[in-house]
Amino acid sequence: MRFIEEFINKGYFHQCTDLDRLTAITKETKIAAYIGFDCTATSLHIGSLMQIMILRLLQQHGHKPIVIIGGGTSKIGDPTWKDEVRKILSKEDIAKNAEGIKKSLSKFIKFGDGKSDAIMLDNAEWLDSFNYLDFLRDFGSYFSVNRMLTMDSVKLRLEREQHLSFLEFNYMLLQAYDFYYLSKHYNCSLQLGGSDQWGNIVMGADLIRKISGKEVFGMTTPLLTTSSGAKMGKTAAGAVWLNEDLLSPYDYYQYWRNCEDADIVRFAKLYSEFTQEELNRFESLAAEDINAAKKQLAYELTKLCHSEQAAKSALETAVKIFEEGQIDENLPTVVLEQEVLQAGISAYELFHEAGLATSKSEARKLIRGNGAKINDRLVADENMIINTNFLLDKKVIKLSAGKKRHILVRV
């Protein structure tokens, strides 16, 4: 199966500047294509997983993936579909975040000097040295303000009478220049991104065409939500991070294990590397087979992101907890100072400290709703004092929020 065919078959396709021509070119030759990522955290989360799998697919078909870290543009902020001005990051924050993002990406693609090896670039390399007057002189005449005002991302802010600074308005010019720079210096002929980036991508392709006459393309992916309408990458407990220092492989496994029934087939197509035969089986699941399919999906996605050993460990932990009722040492762990436990801490405070509730009031609500357990026993009193007497084997306390979120408290 060719790149574009598989791209469409997996559900990645939304829009392309010239799909027929791009299909023909990618059949005949290998291209360089780029995707940009925000540099706003020390890890990517599953909201970026489709873009990451596209980079992986490019590489598998012999094309060269280029990853752009927006070290330059992160200093400004992208107004695309944002209701508020974004926090501007320091150089130190950007450098730390870029390191973590490369760690996320390296789980899925190979970086190096080979023809199809990925490279990662920071657009600060060319944007930081920009002379504003030179930019206006050399590129300003190629951009139409009339057209920029028609971009949906800008129109949204204006229609809501929300503040749109000149700083943010310039973002689309800089993204267009990124594409031009990569086309000129890295022979990049394709920019990929979410459908909310369509306007910015087209502006870049137009800029290249006007200046150099090169044939380049833009292609976008659909914006994904779960079947219930929730945004991919976010849960009530926080983001589903790819790096294990922010989210344990067990919690990553549990996210996919607990996905909604209606999402199983779509997630399998988008995020796994199951064969077509396996995908066909997913599409014809009987009701009694859904749980087994979720386990298989969670295992495969955890293996892909972390390792086969991590997937096995997560599966074993889940079996011990949910099927055998045991405590497993591989559960996510938080450390509590021994002095705190010796003095005693109220149940609601402990659940908040352990991260099973985002606030103390939420912890109280959890306990009042009979959703909290300590060492598998229901917590009836939110003010109950938890001390060293609750330690199992003098080592840990098991906390549970609902049926699927568990954590060990160690001292």
From Swiss-Prot:
Motif 'HIGH' region extends across: 39-48
Q: Name one GO cellular component term.
A: cytosol
Q: Which residues bind ATP?
A: 234
Molecular function per GO: ATP binding; RNA binding; tyrosine-tRNA ligase activity
Q: Which CDD domains match?
A: S4, TyrRS_core
| Organism superkingdom | Bacteria
Q: What class of enzyme is it?
A: ligase
Q: Give its localization.
A: Cytoplasm
Q: What are its E.C. numbers?
A: 6.1.1.1
Task: Give every S4 RNA-binding domain span.
Answer: 345-411
| Record key words, sorted | Aminoacyl-tRNA synthetase, ATP-binding, Cytoplasm, Ligase, Nucleotide-binding, Protein biosynthesis, RNA-binding
Q: What Pfam families does this protein map onto?
A: SYY_C-terminal, tRNA-synt_1b
Q: Which GO terms describe its biological process?
A: tyrosyl-tRNA aminoacylation
Catalyzed chemical reaction(s): tRNA(Tyr) + L-tyrosine + ATP = L-tyrosyl-tRNA(Tyr) + AMP + diphosphate + H(+)
Q: Gene3D superfamilies attached here?
A: HUPs (3.40.50.620), RNA-binding S4 domain (3.10.290.10), Tyrosyl-Transfer RNA Synthetase (1.10.240.10)
Q: Mind telling me which InterPro entries this protein's record contains?
A: aa-tRNA-synth_Ic, Rossmann-like_a/b/a_fold, S4_RNA-bd_sf, SYY-like_C, Tyr-tRNA-ligase, Tyr-tRNA-ligase_bac-type, Tyr-tRNA-ligase_bac_1
Indicate the quaternary assembly.
Answer: Homodimer.
Q: Which PANTHER family match?
A: TYROSINE--TRNA LIGASE, MITOCHONDRIAL, TYROSYL-TRNA SYNTHETASE
> This protein is called what?
Tyrosine--tRNA ligase
Organism, per UniProt? Rickettsia peacockii (strain Rustic)
Could you read off the lineage of the organism from its UniProt record? Bacteria, Pseudomonadati, Pseudomonadota, Alphaproteobacteria, Rickettsiales
* Annotated gene: tyrS
